[in-house]
C-alpha cells in the first residue's frame, strides 16, 4: 500500500512538472493537462479553458521558450487565459529535447505532421470545429514555431495570425531537403533555417514581432532592418527593455501582445 502511494505521488509530481507554475484562476479559467503522443516520448498539451470565452471562434496556441513555463512564457499564457482566449500551450524544451539531444534535425514534413496532430488534438479536446482558425504565439525558441508555420503550405492554411516574442535568427531543429527549398527558405553554413527570410512565406497572414531593444540575439533595431517597414500584414513592436526576457518592461510587452491580437482579429473582420 505504501509503495503504491509512493508511486502515485511520483507520477503526480512528474505530470505536474510539465505545467509547473501554471494554476487555474477561480471563476476565470481552468488549467487542464492532456497527453499528446509525439514520437517515442509522451508530452502534454496544457489548456486554459476560460469560464467565459471572449473569442470562442479562435484557438490560440502558445509555445514556450527554453525555460518552459516560467518568466515570459507563464506571464503571457496566464494573461491570454485571463483575457478569455482558449489557449493550448506546449513546453518547447520538453517537446524538442529528444531531437536536440540526438544532434539531429527533423524534416519539415515530420515536424508538420506532429504540429498538425497537436492542433487536431487541441481542437478536439476543447470541443472546437476542425475549421477553427489558429493564432500562433511563441516566445524565444517557441517563437520559431511562427517561422515553421510559414514553411509548410498545409500549416500556413491553418494559421489565422501569428505573434513572435523575442524572435531569434535561426531554427536549429529543422532541416529542409533541397527539393523543398523555395527562394525564401535560406540556410546558413550549418544548415540552419534562417527565420526572417522565411517569414515572407506567410503572405497575407498577419504577423506581429515583439522584440526587446536590448535582446542579445536580435535587438529590435536589427529586427527592423531584417523585416523592413510595417505593412498591412506585418507589425514590429519595439520594447525598451533590458534583455531577451523583456526585463523592466514586462507590462509594456503584455500590452503589445494585446494590441497585436486586436490587430490580427480586426484584420480578419472581427
Regions found by a protein language model. Give the residues of each.
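N-terminal cap/lid segment of alpha/beta-hydrolase-fold proteins
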Residues: 22-55
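C-terminal catalytic histidine-bearing segment of alpha/beta-hydrolase fold enzymes
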Residues: 232-270
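Cap/lid segment of the alpha/beta-hydrolase catalytic domain
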Residues: 91-109
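The feature captures the conserved acid-bearing segment of alpha/beta-hydrolase catalytic domains
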Residues: 172-224, 228
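Alpha/beta-hydrolase active-site loop
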Residues: 104-128
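Active-site-adjacent alpha-helix of alpha/beta-hydrolase-fold enzymes
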Residues: 81, 214-235, 242, 247-248
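Primarily recognizes the serine-hydrolase "nucleophile elbow" in alpha/beta-hydrolase
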Residues: 123-182
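Short, surface-exposed "cap/lid" segments of acyl-processing enzymes
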Residues: 52-85, 89-92
Amino acid at each position: 500500500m505504501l509503495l503504491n502511494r509512493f508511486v502515485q505521488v511520483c507520477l503526480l509530481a512528474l505530470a505536474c512538472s510539465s505545467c509547473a507554475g501554471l494554476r487555474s484562476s477561480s471563476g476565470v479559467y481552468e488549467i487542464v493537462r492532456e497527453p499528446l503522443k509525439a514520437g517515442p516520448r509522451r508530452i502534454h498539451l496544457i489548456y486554459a479553458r476560460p469560464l467565459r470565452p471572449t473569442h470562442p471562434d479562435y484557438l490560440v496556441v502558445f509555445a514556450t521558450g527554453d525555460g518552459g513555463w516560467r518568466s515570459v512564457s507563464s506571464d503571457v499564457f496566464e494573461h491570454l487565459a485571463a483575457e478569455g482566449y482558449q489557449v493550448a500551450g506546449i513546453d518547447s524544451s520538453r517537446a524538442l529535447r529528444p531531437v536536440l539531444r540526438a544532434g539531429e534535425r527533423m524534416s519539415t514534413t515530420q515536424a508538420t505532421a506532429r504540429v498538425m496532430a497537436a492542433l487536431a488534438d487541441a481542437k478536439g479536446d476543447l470541443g472546437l470545429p476542425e475549421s477553427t482558425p489558429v493564432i500562433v504565439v511563441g516566445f524565444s525558441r517557441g517563437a520559431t514555431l511562427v517561422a515553421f508555420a510559414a514553411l509548410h503550405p498545409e500549416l500556413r492554411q491553418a494559421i489565422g495570425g501569428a505573434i513572435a516574442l523575442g524572435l531569434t535568427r535561426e531554427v536549429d531543429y529543422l532541416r529542409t531537403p533541397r527539393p523543398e527549398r523555395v527562394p525564401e527558405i535560406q540556410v546558413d553554413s550549418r544548415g540552419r533555417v534562417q527565420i526572417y527570410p522565411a517569414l515572407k512565406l506567410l503572405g497575407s497572414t498577419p504577423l506581429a514581432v515583439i522584440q526587446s531593444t536590448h535582446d542579445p540575439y536580435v535587438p529590435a533595431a536589427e529586427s527592423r532592418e531584417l523585416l523592413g517597414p510595417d505593412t498591412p500584414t506585418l507589425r514590429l513592436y519595439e520594447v525598451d527593455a533590458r534583455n531577451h526576457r523583456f526585463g523592466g518592461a514586462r507590462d509594456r510587452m503584455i500590452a503589445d501582445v494585446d494590441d497585436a491580437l486586436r490587430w490580427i482579429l480586426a484584420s480578419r473582420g472581427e
